[in-house]
């Protein structure tokens, strides 16, 4: 897999800016280069190595056709998460994380089925047979479900992994994934506990450019792995067809 990052690029994106030193988590000490003006500066050489390791693991998962859920509900992350996850064809959560999204997935699936049912009502003539008040109530219900669950509407089973922006904010998602043994990839800022994550990417999880750089690299990696998977499947089918043709001659 070609290198996705350059140190200069990460510097321009502000990946190295951590939190105020007084708000740090001591467990992040190995990833901190220095303190400057009361702010911790992340060691980008370590970020570079660890990000590439994380992307290799993501590539391995995506190449088998399994799904990686992207999670980021903070203001700076939500648009990026939605755009990049949709581009990569992955499930995502960019609004509120509902408790039980992973640990009570069967109930969440019921809500998704309800959302799909209301959408069908809009097109199959059902809305023509109910009152205006009932229509408005159903539309409001659907809009709420779409806003919260739209990113996982096509997810039929638990994801193989999570990629998280800001594990402190998404602590419920992290806790659920850990309880189920689902690997967690994450941008981990200097105020967070890296022990909660399987693949730590020490990085500024507040700056839009930093988030965009990392999430885009994840989406690119998934797309490349999926493309390679399809190519390999086509080649395998061609080889199988050629063998059958040879056997029939």
From Swiss-Prot:
GO terms for cellular component: cytosolic small ribosomal subunit. It comes from the Bacteria. One of its GO terms (molecular function) is structural constituent of ribosome. Keywords: Ribonucleoprotein, Ribosomal protein. InterPro entries: Ribosomal_uS2, Ribosomal_uS2_bac/mit/plastid, Ribosomal_uS2_CS, Ribosomal_uS2_flav_dom_sf. The keyword Cell membrane does not apply. GO terms for biological process: translation. The keyword Ion transport does not apply. Gene3D superfamilies: Glucose-6-phosphate isomerase like protein, domain 1, Helix hairpin bin. Belongs to the universal ribosomal protein uS2 family. This is Small ribosomal subunit protein uS2. The lineage of its organism: Bacteria, Pseudomonadati, Chlorobiota, Chlorobiia, Chlorobiales.
